[in-house]
């Protein structure tokens, strides 16, 4: 019986912190903060749309409209002004909006910290110790457009590839939750030369291509961007 008792507690705790996946119960159940505490902005937007879809809201967005049109329960109305939320639904929408605002504010602070980091590095004030490929970091972050980072759930990403016939270099930033990775991948051959079969003046036999990867990792902690893992250069 003891084992069953502990198992029941474990299952209860798991259910209590389970994250909300849809709004099937949002019309009758007040959602708790713990149920959405780990959800991303995208997922919170989905919950809001799911709640409205269950009321028959007709979406203008093509992708969203197509998604809900495939649901057997979705019955879009002709006039969206006729869609009315009850008190419980209004409370849930407010919760989603408040949580979304918090996440958006934190994301903007992270992006601002990255903009400041890039500006400081370009002024010659790099936070990367000199024995951690500091000169490569300066070149890498200069290529990254912070304002063009796009997000899917809690992951943000931007990369740019530069091919100058001599070789191909990829510069990127990857954000996963509170972890930020800035990297540079160097390839010893040109994709353009290879694809177009461009002949060089001195033709030589094919040779092994030298590749190398360098990256630096940061932690977004207490509203600050902290360099926390030494850079790695492989190749």
Language-model features: locations:
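Short, aromatic-enriched amphipathic alpha-helices that serve as compact interaction elements
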Residues: 109-125
């Amino acid at each position: 019986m003891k084992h069953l008792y502990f198992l029941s507690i474990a299952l209860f705790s798991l259910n209590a912190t389970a994250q909300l996946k849809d709004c099937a119960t949002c019309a009758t159940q007040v959602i708790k903060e713990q149920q959405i505490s780990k959800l991303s902005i995208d997922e919170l937007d989905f919950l809001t749309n799911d709640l409205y879809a269950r009321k028959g809201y007709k979406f203008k967005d093509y992708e969203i409209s197509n998604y809900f049109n495939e649901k057997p329960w979705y019955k879009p109305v002709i006039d969206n002004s006729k869609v009315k939320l009850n008190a419980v639904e209004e409370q849930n929408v407010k919760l989603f909006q408040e949580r979304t605002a918090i996440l958006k504010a934190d994301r903007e602070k992270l992006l601002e910290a990255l903009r400041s980091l890039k500006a400081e590095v370009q002024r010659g004030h790099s936070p990367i110790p000199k024995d951690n490929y500091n000169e490569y970091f300066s070149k890498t972050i200069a290529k990254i457009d912070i304002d063009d980072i796009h997000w899917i759930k809690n992951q943000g990403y931007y990369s740019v590839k530069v091919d100058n016939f001599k070789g191909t270099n990829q510069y990127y930033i990857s954000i996963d939750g509170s972890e930020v990775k800035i990297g540079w991948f160097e390839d010893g051959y040109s994709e353009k030369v290879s694809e177009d079969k461009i002949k060089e003046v001195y033709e030589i036999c094919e040779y092994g291509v030298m590749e190398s990867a360098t990256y630096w990792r940061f932690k977004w902690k207490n509203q600050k961007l902290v360099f926390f893992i030494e850079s790695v250069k492989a190749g």
